[in-house]
Every structure is written in C-alpha cells, then in structure tokens.
C-alpha cells in the first residue's frame, strides 16, 4: 500500500510540473508584445538604415541569405547533445510551421525546416535516424566583426566578405564579390557633383541604370530558378491572381515585376519600388522609375515597366537579327523565323513566319498583340508604338510565354468551372458562394 501511494505521489508531482510549465509558456507568449508571433518580433523586422522603412514593418524582400543562418546551416556545425535542458536556447525560440529548432550551443539556436534538415543529412551521407553527433565541416566559420556589406555575383548582399565565402562553401557554388556595398552595384563612372545637389539625369545615365538593374534582375532570377518549387512556396496566393494579364516583357524583367508586385494588382506603388532604392547616393535610380510613370499617377503598370526598360536598350529587332545571323553562321537554318525590321532597327507592325504560314501584329519592340495571330497576312494597320498608351490607367491582356502548359491547362479548367458556375447561378436564383 505504501508503494502504491508513493507511485501516485510521484505521478501527481510530474503532472503538476508539466501543467505549470505549459501555463508558464502560455503566459510568456501572452505577455509578449507580439503575442507569441515571431513575425512581429523586432529581430525579424527590417531597420530604417537598411531599407529606409519604418521600424516594425515586415520586408518581404529582405535578403534571406543572411537570415539567421537558415540557408547556411549544415550538419557540420557544432551540436552539443549534452546541453542542459534548463539552458536550452530553443526554449526561447519560436519556429514557424514545418520547422524545428536546432541548438548549437547555449546561446545559438536556429530554425530548420524538416525537408532542409533531411536534405542536408542526405548530402552529408548521414541517415537522420542514425545521427549521433557533429560532422566535421570544411567551411570556415566567420568571426563577429563590424559589417562591411558586399554584393555577390549571385545578386545577394552579404554583411561582409567572409559571409559570402562561407555561403559559397556551404552551397558548393562559385560566388565572387561583384562590388562593395549593397546590390545592385553602382556604375563605374564617378559623379563629380555633390550628393545633396539634385540634377537632371541624362539619357546615357538612364541607360546605365537600366542595364545595371537588368543585370541584377538576371542574377537574382538565375539564382532563384535553381529551385523550381520556390515560386509555389513563396507565392501561395498566385492561384487567386488573374494570370491572363501579365507583363509583356519576358525573362528577368517580367519575373522581377511579379516579385515586386506583392498585392497582385499589376501596379507597382512607391512602397513596392522602395526595395530597389538601396543606394542613397544613386540619384538616377529613382529618377529613372519616375520617368517610367507616363501617367504621372505614382504607379507603374506592367506595361510601363516593360517599355521603360526596353526603350533604354539597343534597337531590339536589329539586335535579334544580329544574334540569329551569329548563330546561323554561313548556313541558313530551314524553318528559322526571321524578324522584319524597319530602318531604325525596330520591329515592323506585321511579322510573319513563312514556314508555318502565320502572321501576327507586334509593337515596335516585338511584343505580340494578343489575338492577332492568324493563318495568312494579318491586318496590322494600327500603330502600336507605345509612349504611355498602355499605362497604369489602362489594362490590356497579354500572354506570358514562361507559363507552363500545366498553368494553361489550369486556366482552361477554371474557365470551364466558371461557365458551370454561371449555369448554376442561372438555375439557382440569387444564391452566391461568397466570391465576386
């Protein structure tokens, strides 16, 4: 009888201690100013000095390469399995969903996704079920020093060069220092005027800004395209977005527009463009985007964005024609589409592909007019030269060649579903499902 009583007392004490610990954790979360939400924690938010925004505003475009070693954590980092549970730093760490806390010492803890943790274990040749201790890492750890930002060749900003070298070692990639300071790199041509003196930027300076930004967007695009699932993970609301209206420019320019357009309204306001204004001494960057706003409504539409960059480059038709001639060499490839250029090097309104017998209408930059492609000669009497006609006050539908066939299939399925819903609405009267 005494043994049974002792066992009951021990169980009751253990249950009480667990209840008190749970209550203390809940009270700590409620007592915090952020309500236990790590997205509201100041350490996760951007600062005024880095992005010129108010403290307490979540910046979706902060450089994730530098975020708490999420991307750079590897099983090779020290891991002490004999940590005192009372001093476990993970007790103070709030990880998001699908992530686990890994304690490296008494003061360092990082949140690692389950998938990334398993992937890193496989790369290291260690089964996560058999992991019993640290793995020797060949990547040199960086000391704590005063930040000296550098821009890497992958388009990301690093707090100092050692961080860049460590990131390259962990990822097994070749990353070099492109310039000192934040990305994008400034032009090589020094400015002789004072930084406080506002002046008008020349066309040559606008072209340099456009080329520099285009190179930066390309580096970011190529770096982000290595993981095709990133687009789906980072843009969960894309399925609610009308994909029939997309930037008419392709590749990195259209990709960057979609990344900046955080509210999916096909317009870039000043808060969305502010992520690009990283170099305070570069006066022509903001002036360049101001020149893109042809409607002067403080908004840049998808078409204004594309044409603003396109008009700052060499004549597009002549450039494409020269590239085709270089690829062909002496031999002329059968079935090759040859663009028709005007005397200024821009595209003629009517373009035809003789091998397939189709013609279509384009603007002077080669952007195809939706619905104009037919078998035979197209009637392209309208002048599609743009100087703000398709700006933020006027939407036009364009197709995006980068969309996958699955996306096109999904769009067709959605159209069929909409038709069925319309039929149901006609039969059901005034019933609504809550969507407009």
Swiss-Prot record:
Glycosylation sites (chain numbering): 387, 392
Swiss-Prot/TrEMBL keywords: Calcium, Disulfide bond, Extracellular matrix, Glycoprotein, Heparan sulfate, Metalloenzyme inhibitor, Metalloprotease inhibitor, Protease inhibitor, Proteoglycan, Secreted, Signal
The protein's name: Testican-3
Tissues in which the UniProt entry reports expression: Expressed in brain.
Stated role: May participate in diverse steps of neurogenesis. Inhibits the processing of pro-matrix metalloproteinase 2 (MMP-2) by MT1-MMP and MT3-MMP. May interfere with tumor invasion.
Location of the Thyroglobulin type-1 domain: 314-380
Chief site of localization: secreted
Signal sequence extent: 1-22
SUPFAM superfamilies assigned to the protein according to its UniProt record, in alphabetical order: EF-hand (SSF47473), Kazal-type serine protease inhibitors (SSF100895), Thyroglobulin type-1 domain (SSF57610)
GO terms for MF: calcium ion binding; collagen binding; extracellular matrix binding; glycosaminoglycan binding; peptidase inhibitor activity
Biased composition (Acidic residues): 399-430
PROSITE patterns linked: KAZAL_2, THYROGLOBULIN_1_1, THYROGLOBULIN_1_2
Subcellular location(s) per record: Secreted, Extracellular space, Extracellular matrix
Keyword Cell inner membrane (UniProt): no
Disulfide bond positions: 90-101, 95-111, 139-169, 142-162, 151-183, 317-341, 352-359, 361-380
